């Protein structure tokens, strides 16, 4: 048995873009009865009935009119999302994930009539996201391939008109790459970038649990109003409720706004198939954080689970850099179970952040890039995040475990209330 003390934490949880929001203020307690080995957590203990009619298939007409559930020391109340600033402490820092969803689904029709879908996961050559979208003539991606057996290795072709130019996109299978496939794309013309290709030919991926085809409206509604950096294949949906008006209210309320970039991968939809969480392989995601965010020492409010994973990963990144100041930036990575290693050094959160700032000063960089595989489950000791805005998540998901860890296991009362009070769930649902 281990005793883990979680600091006084206010949690604001806002589910997704068009439904009900939830603000959680949770005073996390001493977890004296927590299992030493968090890997033994049974995912079946985090199940709940979610009828299909509770899943929001489309957003509300106005983003900020979704419901907001507020949880404060076991007390639950409701509001509308556009009033969120009134529930936040002045002088806090709210962290947003500014990633932008790309049109990652490409469809090719073989001469035989077979339809092949190529779902872009992660850039391979070039590996840098910004360079990838600017590249011309050729690039390679790690992908999921639908109907792979029907491909049989032939070159796939598809023509499209871009900027008045007839462009033929060619796709060639290279090799299997762990759980994905390496695909090389090529096309003629120095004036057509891969970003142009996706804009003209790609389809926006929406969550599979919506059980519908992507519509033209999703190109707008499945992006946050502050999205900037292309790279995600799924939206950071806690941010979908924010409007320019809400952001202005936050500014007027004295809330500092900072942005990080975490490109959300398809792994966010990966179900937990093992009985115990220790058997689940958490997906890895790439992160970019600016120096200004690290220098802001205000109380931290995370918008969404991607922001939580980013911010909490910073603590463990600081531990690494405190121990070894010469690590190459390309090798900076947080392993899945790293936070639960009781033998690692202990630093105060600000000391860990200072180690990152010192590293950045020595390297003369204004942003730091790294990847994280961190999994946050009950028993996790939150280091930096004090409030959380998030969605209502799927049963038996790693995201639900993250929320449970944040509210000291009281997730059932929150979700029972939401289910019985007409809250809308998942990506286009409400917020908490």
Each language-model region and where it sits:
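Short hydrophobic targeting helices and cationic amphipathic motifs
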Residues: 6, 22, 28-31
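Short helix-onset patch at the extreme N-terminus, typifying the N->h transition
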Residues: 7-8, 45
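Ser/Thr/Pro/Gly-rich low-complexity, intrinsically disordered segments
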Residues: 11-13
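Surface-exposed, charge/polar-rich loops and edge strands
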Residues: 28-432
